[in-house]
Amino acid sequence: MVVATALCTVALSGCVAPAPDDAAYESKAASTAQAALSEARTALLGVRTRADDRLPSTYLEPVLVDAEQALGEIRTTFDSVQPPPTRAADKLRGTLDPLLESAASDATELRIAARRERPGALGTAADDLAGIADELERFAQEHGT
């Protein structure tokens, strides 16, 4: 997980330059959505594995912390990209940025629920994150090449 997060961060750190046109920005947005999707699915896998009693709670917490941090970094990196001055770029950003924010927030809720050992809250947060993950997947598919 740590290696995946590091690779994701390194891969996305190259996305800080301005996007010269809509196609480049759309490509960066699709890559960002895919990276966020990967982190969200990792967190959800940890929660499901814990719910099946196949993962100790002491391991779930670091999995969730790593996903939470990675999602925050992914969002920060995407937000640092200067979009081209077009309505299409603004619309793309307006669609993806709230998804990234929700994914990061849901990952935080997962971590809090796991630390407090509240299975009901953990399940609710997992359902919320699963919905956002599905939206991230649709976004990545729609805008990927």
Residue ranges and their predicted role:
Residues 1-5:
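Bacterial N-terminal signal peptides that target proteins for export
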Residues 10-14:
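C-terminal motif of bacterial Sec signal peptides marking the signal peptidase cleavage site
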Residues 15-19:
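Bacterial signal peptide processing site
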Residues 20-23, 137-145:
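Short, charged, intrinsically disordered terminal tails
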Residues 28-108, 121-124, 128-142:
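Alpha-helical segments in soluble extracytoplasmic regions
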Residues 109-118:
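Membrane-helix boundary connector in multi-pass membrane proteins
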